[in-house]
Design a protein with these regions (language model features):
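Substrate/ligand-engaging "lid" and interaction regions
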Residues: 1-224
């Protein structure tokens, strides 16, 4: 947050580096939301709109404030939701437009962030199951000398831990749209670079053929 000047300046230093090619996001689908169900702004979003880039606090406001400082870049949402890049782009453009109304930015900035040849929002599809933290893995890590690895049960009866355990199969399909170049992402295990249509079809296949129908079919058996 911009209330911590040292962190804010460090973030700006990183974001304005010409070598920066991409910024990835895993903030859940709710992290892109600017409005409540009734269409009104969340209070922190309303404050960000009124206060402008120099006092941004929310994730989307901070991102747009950083975009005001820099060069071509790809903003890559890796959250597990359909058309994630479009959701991120909509939030960025909404915040930018609201700042324009307040006089914090001008038309040139809106044109800049709207041009996907300059600021891209690649779509991605992630398919990897991460079940609740395993006590066995926690024990194994502690046996290796890593301290305080045991899962914690929250007040909402969810499990959290300092580690993540997951199934071995994994698929990450990324739209190959990077205005300032990119790392060799395809060298990663289970990572595939593709066009937007392929990413969208992969997402559709995951939720209509490979994953949800199987869960829906086997769920009643578990109840029985």
């Amino acid at each position: 947050q911009s209330s911590d000047l040292a962190q804010w300046n460090r973030l700006k230093e990183i974001f304005t580096s010409k070598s920066l090619q991409m910024v990835s996001f895993t903030i859940t689908e709710k992290g892109y939301a600017l409005q409540k169900a009734d269409g009104t702004w969340f209070p922190f979003v309303e404050a960000d709109i009124k206060n402008g880039p120099d006092k941004a606090t929310g994730a989307m406001a901070v991102l747009v404030a950083m975009l005001y400082e820099r060069y071509p870049i790809a903003l890559v949402s890796m959250d597990n939701c359909s058309k994630n890049g479009a959701k991120l782009r909509e939030s960025v453009l909404t915040m930018a437009e609201e700042w324009k109304k307040q006089g914090f930015v001008d038309d040139d900035f809106i044109t800049y962030v709207s041009d996907e040849k300059v600021v891209a929002f690649p779509w991605t599809m992630i398919d990897k199951i991460t079940p609740r933290p395993s006590e066995q893995i926690a024990d194994d890590l502690e046996a290796l000398g890593v301290e305080k690895m045991q899962p914690v049960i929250t007040g909402k009866k969810t499990y959290i831990a300092p580690f993540v355990n997951a199934e071995k199969p994994q698929y990450l399909v990324i739209e190959d749209s990077f205005p300032n170049g990119r790392p060799a992402l395809e060298k990663g295990f289970g990572v595939y670079m593709a066009d937007r249509n392929t990413v969208n079809l992969s997402e559709r296949m995951k939720v209509t053929v490979c994953l949800n129908p199987v869960h829906s079919a086997t769920g009643p058996l578990g109840v029985v």
